[in-house]
Amino acid sequence: MLWRGSQALRHFSTSRVYFKNKLKLALIGQSLFGQEVYSQLLKEGHRVVGVFTVPDKDGKADPLALAAEKDGTPVFKFPRWRLKGKTIKEVAEAYQSVGAELNVLPFCTQFIPMDVIDSPKHGSIIYHPSLLPRHRGASAINWTLIMGDKKAGFSVFWADDGLDTGPILLQRSCDVKPNDTVDSLYNRFLFPEGIKAMVEAVQLIADGKAPRTPQPEEGATYEGIQKKENAEVSWDQPAEGLHNWIRGHDKVPGAWAEINGQMVTFYGSSLLTSSVPSGEPLDIRGAKKPGLVTKNGLVLFGNDGKALMVRNLQFEDGKMIPASQYFSAGETSVVELTAEELKVAETIKVIWARILSNTPVIEDSTDFFKSGASSMDVVRLVEEIRQSCGGLQLQNEDVYMATKFGDFIQKVVRRLRGEDEEAEMVVDYVSKEVNGMTVKIPYQCFINGQFVDAEDGETYATVNPTDGTTICRVSYASLADVDRAVAAAKDAFENGEWGRMNARDRGRLMYRLADLMEENQEELATIEALDSGAVYTLALKTHIGMSVQTFRYFAGWCDKIQGSTIPINQARPNYNLTFTKKEPLGACAIIIPWNYPLMMLAWKSAACLAAGNTLVLKPAQVTPLTALKFAELTVKAGFPKGVINIIPGSGGVAGQRLSQHPDIRKLGFTGSTSVGKQIMKSCAVSNLKKVSLELGGKSPLIIFSDCDLEKAVRMGMGAVFFNKGENCIAAGRLFVEEAIHDEFVTRVVEEIKKMKIGDPLDRSTDHGPQNHRAHLEKLLQYCETGVQEGATLVYGGRQVQRPGFFMEPTVFTGVEDHMYLAKEESFGPIMVISKFQNGDIDGVLQRANNTEYGLASGVFTRDINKAMYVSDKLEAGTVFINTYNKTDVAAPFGGMKQSGFGKDLGEEALNEYLKIKTVTLEY
């Protein structure tokens, strides 16, 4: 085989080109899929000797033809291969001239004669988008969804004289998600994996390893092609059947019904998993029950009483509208264009004219699709407008919803003016009458400024730890949801208003958000109490109060982030100036724990936003609700779409995807050390993203005999029992000097007996429930281990006998350095006390530092010299002297050793979300 020099150079480092067998291929087909298969086959070193595709349409070549022509590959564009049942001689001769060893048909709409199919040495292989023998025929993907199949996939098979009946070479499958459409299934799996499989199949043939597995007749089905005339909805079926029919026809040919005498097509169907919202009835011919036009879309009902939601409607003239606007679709007034807007309209008219090259004049009545445009042209139109109109962001659906030029210009102008933004954010709430108020709780993913269901419709229950009941079901973010959220954050940073906003205006938004949080502090604190078990009075002061303070503090930093000038050696006789700039990183990910759901959000996101970044935040799976309420407030504060995205779900799915995502430039994490290590590894392997980790702790608190004992008892209890012990800096081990040890323990037990354990919404409650059942069970096991190892259980150690996840405040003494209790964090209301000899300062310091953790620490003594000596020697990110838990928004917070690195709070936190650029100029 002869290779051009450029080919050899291009593949020099890719040994697979030289050490694998390669074939001469004829590619027969069309479309972007065909183009990608063609390109990948070339990269693998195969030689495409000819491309056989469809003729140009309206002067535009198919993507496969364009790619091949650009490479100099022979391209043949035949309108047909046969005439009156016989192969056209000229076509056959042209095909034979290329000398192919294998025909590859990635996507082909033409009938290819069998003499062509069988002509090459290795025959022909075809891609088919179903798991053959199921769904033979041209509408295979549609029928996969229409029939409610749980598995979808594709087959690469050897062509024979039957209809999709040839032997199987390979197959790949995937799960069908509840709300998959033809497009989502194709884009997620059939397109990308299909390309890989076609290339793999060709290589298997080249290596002589390709199987030929006969198709079984058992389970074989053949369905006809779906066209508009046979896509009408049949209403006598369950909601799931209606949903499958609609999504199986989305976008082509489109499932439809007759409404008010005209054909209306449904798009964007999803099954309703919550209660049916209120709306205005809409009669639909043939439907047993009227639909409901709601603020979220059109609700349709199956014969089983269950419901589905349709997002968009399309009328006979091609115009598409949000289904929620059905009764107001014709009420929009025409806007008068300014001189500047007229210039934009002329620019867009030129773009339309280029795309619709066969349309002599573009007029207001010119319809984009009726003038010959296809779905590919929609993408081109959106991209050309973005490039030519100052980065104006349109969506593909904007074109479908305004197909005539005049309507399209009106939509563009409204977008430029901000008039097409929703007047009121659409939020589905779960409402609770609790704590003397009506609490409204969002429960969906918050992506790109909208509350939306998870793409696959999955939800999970979030539980009230006070009584173990379900508060509501929350959207469970999938990988696709994470990707959408990251894309929104990336776009908002690179192309949106946020990236162009003045720093002072950014600060103004953050101040406004802090004010809204303060105005809604009672509701936020109530949600925090319901979802995390936080005592309401503590939630008001700390969980919510410090969150408000954090946003105000960092709002003030927005316009004070600055670089410096640096004197360097001059390039004499010229001069140099060197300065640094601090710049945001881009789209950041934040993963927070469950102990302070809103405060942990604030600690990280406020600094991230002040630095100018955008973010995707994953709250803890068990405590997502205050984060979602916070998302609602960000919209009310005026934050642009995509700046803040909240995705509830699991760490194993959503969290892992964020740590691996190539478009995330920084990840801030608070959680366990073991998970932190995995995150750091994923961040390094993916794209070496910047990381800050606030991890586990076993914070020592040393209490000397010369302390203020009353204060030491009070604050020592707070160091352990504050927030039910679910506190990252909780004193994990108390070292009490021998002279006061017994009295200290006695006083602590006396004070514990005064504590009221109960409903966190009761204003007199001191100690609420543990966050969730699994954590409570872990704490009980922790206590059991302590007893088994010989520690003395002085008080508690049991679950409180009442509904919910309540645990008694617990005290252990006699804890030796080798014991499990001395080494491992409980993260609960368990005081672990060890005695140390009188006057043995260095000895107790050695014991206190004998841990891999280094988050916080404390010392109580009246001797300032002793206090300062101890603070110097303690290996921890924070040292408290004669106090504990005294954090402040202006004081940097973070650990060392295996408690992590990086800082929250204070000016230092900003540096976690900034990069420094050095600029040197000569003059």
Swiss-Prot record:
Record PTM: Phosphopantetheinylation at Ser-375 by AASDHPPT is required for the formyltetrahydrofolate dehydrogenase activity.
CDD domains: ALDH_F1L_FTFDH (cd07140), FDH_Hydrolase_C (cd08703), FMT_core_FDH_N (cd08647)
O-(pantetheine 4'-phosphoryl)serine modifications at: S375
SUPFAM superfamilies associated with the record: ACP-like, ALDH-like, FMT C-terminal domain-like, Formyltransferase
Marked site: Essential for catalytic activity: D164
Catalytic reaction list: (6R)-10-formyltetrahydrofolate + NADP(+) + H2O = (6S)-5,6,7,8-tetrahydrofolate + CO2 + NADPH + H(+)
Keyword Membrane: no
Major enzyme class: oxidoreductase
Residues with the Phosphoserine modification: S31, S650
An annotated GO cellular component: nucleoplasm
GO biological process: 10-formyltetrahydrofolate catabolic process; biosynthetic process; fatty acid beta-oxidation; folic acid metabolic process; NADPH regeneration; one-carbon metabolic process
Record GO terms (molecular function): formyltetrahydrofolate dehydrogenase activity; oxidoreductase activity, acting on the aldehyde or oxo group of donors, NAD or NADP as acceptor
Knocked-out gene: effects: Homozygous knockout mice lacking Aldh1l2 are viable and fertile and no embryonic lethality is observed. They do not display phenotypic differences in terms of growth, food consumption and development. 10-formyl-THF and dihydrofolate accumulate in the liver of the knockout mice. It is associated with a decrease in levels of NADPH and ATP specifically in the mitochondrion. Male knockout mice accumulate more fats in the liver which is associated with impaired beta-oxidation of fatty acids.
Family: In the N-terminal section; belongs to the GART family.
Record note on domains: The N-terminal hydrolase domain has an NADP-independent formyltetrahydrofolate hydrolase activity, releasing formate and tetrahydrofolate.
UniProt name for this protein: Mitochondrial 10-formyltetrahydrofolate dehydrogenase
Source organism (scientific name): Mus musculus (Mouse)
Lineage of the species this protein comes from: Eukaryota, Metazoa, Chordata, Craniata, Vertebrata
